[in-house]
């Protein structure tokens, strides 16, 4: 993990904040702060241990504090194990704070872009080697949301990565 920010600004436009949320409210990572009515806009969650320092018309500001001893832990959720697909899965992911607009469109073939985003940026390939289970899980979740028949992983030409059961395109 990297350094934690001292102050976090969260966009609250369009969100209905949870009742009782106000300045000085203690927050912890994964705490629900607001819900968005749009089906493809992820709900709003705290990302750090801290307290609400300010709420404006457009933002919620969180000031970092040391975690309290009684702060709840966020429990992992096994979305694959729940067997959800399509809109039901997209709604479950939305309730976890993920914007799903580009994830849930139905398609026959889903192409996952694993290319480095910009020239000189070289983190994508090491991630493909060291985080294979995360990659598989993410690809399966995306496949289920899009109800795709085929999933292809696009990797850089000359890439040395290979995965059992995952077709590659160069």
Predicted features along the sequence, with ranges:
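N-terminal, Lys/Arg-enriched amphipathic/low-complexity engagement segments
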Residues: 1-20, 35
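A structural signal for short beta-strand/turn segments enriched in small hydrophobics and glycine
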Residues: 24-33
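Buried, small/hydrophobic-residue-enriched core segments of structured protein domains
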Residues: 46, 56-170
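Conserved hydrophobic positions within beta-strands
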Residues: 50-52
């Amino acid at each position: 993990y990297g350094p934690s920010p001292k102050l976090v600004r969260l966009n609250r436009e369009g969100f209905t904040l949870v009742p009782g949320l106000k300045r000085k409210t203690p927050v912890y990572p994964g705490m629900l702060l607001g819900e968005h009515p749009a089906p493809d806009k992820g709900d709003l969650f705290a990302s750090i241990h801290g307290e609400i320092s300010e709420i404006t018309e457009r933002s919620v500001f969180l000031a970092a504090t040391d975690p309290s001893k009684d702060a709840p832990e966020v429990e992992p959720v096994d979305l694959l194990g729940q067997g959800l697909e399509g809109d039901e899965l997209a709604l479950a992911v939305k309730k976890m704070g993920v914007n799903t607009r580009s994830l849930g469109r139905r398609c026959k073939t889903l192409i996952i872009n694993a290319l480095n985003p910009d020239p000189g940026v070289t983190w994508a390939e090491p991630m493909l080697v060291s985080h294979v289970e995360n990659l598989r899980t993410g690809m399966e979740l995306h496949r289920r949301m899009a109800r795709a028949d085929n999933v292809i992983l696009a990797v850089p030409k000359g890439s040395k990565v290979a995965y059992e059961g995952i077709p590659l395109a160069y």
